[in-house]
Amino acid sequence: VFAYAPHYEKLEANAEKIGFVPCKDLKGLTAKADTLVMACKPYQIEGVLSEIKEELKGKALISIAAGWNYDKYEEYLDKSTRFQFIMPNTPAMVGEGVLLFEEKNSLLPEEREEIKKLFEALGIVIELPVHLMGIGGALTGCGPAFVDLIIEALGDAGVKYGVPRKQAYEMVSQMIIGSAKLQLETGEHPGVLKDNVCLSLIHISEPTRP
């Protein structure tokens, strides 16, 4: 695995920790690889593509940058460059992410299967048509921020009543993990699961009633 970043010293330090080969030159990196992952900020993509467009000919490009889907890349890439847009989320950092694969792509079938296997190590892979990638990204990409807000708020409530902060966050985070796993494994409607809690703990039913 080869990697390039503008700040070589930082890249080199990370290479020792993670185990990849750092490259000082973007074009040199592109020449060495058959499949490349575009992981820079969206505003940087146009500049990167202008530098390596020729080197990308005949290669596969995977992009995880929000806002740049297949149709947008098609405007900049040579027709021989194969492409796939993937939208990950932050829980992928711990192997529990949601990886949204845009159905529209130009990868070879065997390439796409290899890429899916690679990203499955980071979480669950879900394929979506082009018109659903926006809302899908909002749900899975922005959703973690709302969950973090809940963790913070419930944790603060625990702290207010004497629970140590670290323990409060641990309790709330595990509760969310367990609740999510219960829904995934049972397939029950979230409303049914909510009612089950309210029936067993009747004193919380009023605040959760619409």
Label the predicted regions.
Residues 202-210:
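Conserved small/polar residues in nucleotide/adenosyl-binding loops
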Residues 8, 18, 26-101, 105:
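Rossmann-like NAD(P)(H) cofactor-binding subdomain of soluble oxidoreductases
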Residues 11, 154, 204:
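Aromatic/hydrophobic pocket-lining residues that form π-stacking "cages" and hydrophobic walls in ligand
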